[in-house]
Amino acid sequence: MDIVTLAEVAGNLNVVGYGLAAIGPGIGLGILIGKTIEGTARQPELGSRLQTLMFLGLAFVEVLALLGFVLAFIK
C-alpha cells in the first residue's frame, strides 16, 4: 500500500468515528427528554424543576459529544 491509500483509509476511519461520536449522545438526548416529559406528565407541579435538571443534563451530554469531535481533530 502506498502512502496516499493509507491516508484515504485513515480519513474514512475518522468519518466513521464522527458518526459513532454522534450516535451515543443522540440516543442519550432522546432518553433524557422523553423521561423529562414522562416525569412532568406524572407530576406537573415538578415541571420547572425537571426542566432545569434536563437542561443541565443536556449540557453534559453535549459536552461529551463535542469532546468526541474535538479529539478526532486533535489526532
From Swiss-Prot:
Membrane topology: Multi-pass membrane protein
Protein family according to the UniProt entry: Belongs to the ATPase C chain family.
Gene name in the database record: atpE
NCBIfam families, A to Z: ATP_synt_c
Compartments where found: Cell membrane
Site location (Reversibly protonated during proton transport): 62
Keywords per UniProt: ATP synthesis, Cell membrane, CF(0), Hydrogen ion transport, Ion transport, Lipid-binding, Membrane, Transmembrane, Transmembrane helix, Transport
Quaternary state and interactors: F-type ATPases have 2 components, F(1) - the catalytic core - and F(0) - the membrane proton channel. F(1) has five subunits: alpha(3), beta(3), gamma(1), delta(1), epsilon(1). F(0) has three main subunits: a(1), b(2) and c(10-14). The alpha and beta chains form an alternating ring which encloses part of the gamma chain. F(1) is attached to F(0) by a central stalk formed by the gamma and epsilon chains, while a peripheral stalk is formed by the delta and b chains.
InterPro entries for the chain: ATP_synth_csu_bac/chlpt, ATP_synth_F0_csu, ATP_synth_F0_csu_DDCD_BS, ATP_synth_F0_csu_sf, ATPase_proteolipid_c-like_dom, F/V-ATP_Csub_sf
Protein function: F(1)F(0) ATP synthase produces ATP from ADP in the presence of a proton or sodium gradient. F-type ATPases consist of two structural domains, F(1) containing the extramembraneous catalytic core and F(0) containing the membrane proton channel, linked together by a central stalk and a peripheral stalk. During catalysis, ATP synthesis in the catalytic domain of F(1) is coupled via a rotary mechanism of the central stalk subunits to proton translocation. Key component of the F(0) channel; it plays a direct role in translocation across the membrane. A homomeric c-ring of between 10-14 subunits forms the central stalk rotor element with the F(1) delta and epsilon subunits.
PROSITE patterns reported for this sequence: ATPASE_C (PS00605)
UniProt-recorded name of the protein: ATP synthase subunit c
Entry GO MF terms: lipid binding; proton-transporting ATP synthase activity, rotational mechanism
Record has Transferase as a keyword: no
SUPFAM superfamilies: F1F0 ATP synthase subunit C (SSF81333)
Native species: Bifidobacterium adolescentis (strain ATCC 15703 / DSM 20083 / NCTC 11814 / E194a)
Cellular component GO terms, alphabetical: plasma membrane; proton-transporting ATP synthase complex; proton-transporting two-sector ATPase complex, proton-transporting domain
Any one Pfam family match given in the protein's UniProt record, by short name: ATP-synt_C
UniProt keyword Isomerase, yes or no: no
